Amino acid sequence: MGGLRRRSLLAAAGGTAAAAGLTSTGPSPAQAVPRAAAAGATEAPVPSGRRPGPYDRKVDALLARMTLEEKLGQLQQLPWAYDTGPGGPGTKAVEEAARAGRLGSVLSIFGARTCNALQRIAVEESRLGIPLLFGLDVIHGFWTTFPIPLAQAASFDPQVAARDAEVSAREARSNGVHWTFAPMMDVTHEPRWGRIAEGNGEDPYLTAAFAAAKVRGYQGDRLSAGDRIAACAKHFVAYGGAEGGRDYNTVDVSESRLRNLYLPPFKAALDAGAATVMAAFNTIGGVPAHANPHTLTDLLRREWGFDGMVVSDWNGVQELIPHGVAEDGADAARLALNAGVDMEMTSTHLVTHGRRLLREGRISARRVDDAVARVLRLKFALGLFAHPYADEDGAIGAPSAKSRAAARAAASRSMVLLKNDRGVLPLARSVGSLAVVGPFGDSTDLLGTWVMPPAAEKFPAGTVLDAVRRAAPGSTVRHARGVAPQGDDTSGIPAAVAAAEACEVTVVVVGEPPALSGEAAARSDIGLPGAQRQLVEAVAGTGKPFVVVLVNGRPLTVADWVERAPAVLVAWHPGIEAGPALADVLFGAVNPGGKLPVSFPRSAGQIPVHYNHENTGRPYSPDDKYTSKYLDLPDGPQFPFGHGLSYTTFRTGAPELSTGRIAVGALREGDTVEVAATVTNTGSRPGDEVVQLYVHDRVASIAQPVRRLRGFRRVALAPGKSRTVRFRLAAADLGFWSNDPHGEFRLEPGAIDLYVGGSSAADQKATLTLT
């Protein structure tokens, strides 16, 4: 989503009042390798055979009354306000377009009164009275800011995402918003990419589970309900594969990787009912996603049967020109519409050039009607024709106690304990003295990327310092920032060291400011910014116990100091209840149970490093130089996918299978294999363990990842208690997509190793033979 949208909210604010995831989500076969869209190419045919829908008669009747200009207007989305950047006519022109019936949607608008004023123009002053569709980036909260999506994935509990979406939808819909541009489900192996904060990490299975949960949370059972909003599956597709982690960059991906890595979360989101899809900024094989009929039409429409609306990303149609595939705006409009884009965000090429393109035969009236029908069906589904206005008296203007409690629980459930040497954590509430140091110790800038500016201003995050003081009221709590979030000034470090030396234990709160993650926030160096590393080393030099709390929007490189830190807790950007949630974990009211949804690399030069890499012909060996490795780094990440400790300990037994052999034909007919594993709390505290199931196909027709996540379950156990966790493996979990141009799914005979445990390094193993 374009970075201009966040800035636009600042102007818009002035007018406002205020355990799923265990089933396979593999997509169906498709020809998804893109072919170049030649300048003279005809449109991608409109998919046929669509099932009749409940609003078809109403939509057809409305289409019959609409002029061409009104139809093209329904395909236009304009921003309500903005300050700089390309495109966008300003609020007066938006009102004029609504009055003329030449506008379908408005983004970056919220507030019941503001939305109603604009909606009245469309409904009461335009010829046909077609209501507007109001969209907003409700990514991880509206008023109640939850942890960033990457943090939520660390909970390994999709209900965390569902609860975020439910709260967000209720608050947003009451303020006039109908549609969110979320969830983002771009799998990535690139921690340098800033938008990793908006997604769910490096694994397609985990991402698919969270994508589906969030769609269900936003949309519920009925879009027309007064507390639900339409979801948008973005960015279609492979945006997370941007070269070098630089945003908007090129993606070059094989058919197999596209289908095995990038597509499963989208299929899961659509199976969960996602109403819309957003095209991606990147190219795939040289073809921009906004002009790619093979992903937007052949795969999305024909194979998967998606009948919803596809929206461009911010200025995505216009950007076909600098991509070098469109000569001008008319050509860009032609390419996008014919590829499968239904609504143009920000730029205005379809509404400007549509009549000429039709006259010249470069687009068809049928394709225009198809796109308009998708827009109108969504408006009917949302109930906008019957109830176009928000209830101004019922608009939610602040987080509730209940929503804050949900955000607090989500934040603590998402935190990951990387290490805890000598049992430094949890802290005793009776500790005599405690220091809080670091640039984020007293900071409210802990909400994360993509936060609505009025929410950040009115409802900032609770600070760690305040929460620690409340949690340990009898303790002497000292504070010193030491250093700023960015910059090389170390003059404050002596004060921080003095505070640490004077106290029994120190909490060092360091990390990234939210501005360093998110869109257009790629970093070549993903270590602690500025002088923060020097602060950690200085505190370590005191010899006193200390804990490092990381607040971050991506994995960080920590190799240069982590061995000196007795305990490290990853808090991510935790949202509105940051301080209280951190205090809950630091003092043991909550036992951390989160797991890493993405690997932490040893250095930026090691990227990409991820658990689900493929075999090579020369696997790593520490004793053989001529194997796949770096000469100056140990093999593997600093902390692997799925890693996370607890204040207690767990033991997971070997997996037990319902059968050790199963025929490929039986799997294709729907048979499954049950995998059971018993986990025991072997420590002295109650706690949560995430039991994870991985598979590896030993010999296949194309090289397979060394491990693939195929199940997870978060379980709570009292000390000494055990529980047997059961998973079911189906054909989709045991096969893979080949590089066949038609997207062939293969399920081949042979041995498949199964691993269960508490991380991707799980060593409890069994073998299943496919015959």
Where are these regions (language model features)?
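Glycoside hydrolase catalytic-domain context in secreted enzymes
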Residues: 2, 24-760
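N-terminal export signals
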Residues: 2, 8-27
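Short beta-strand elements
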Residues: 762-771
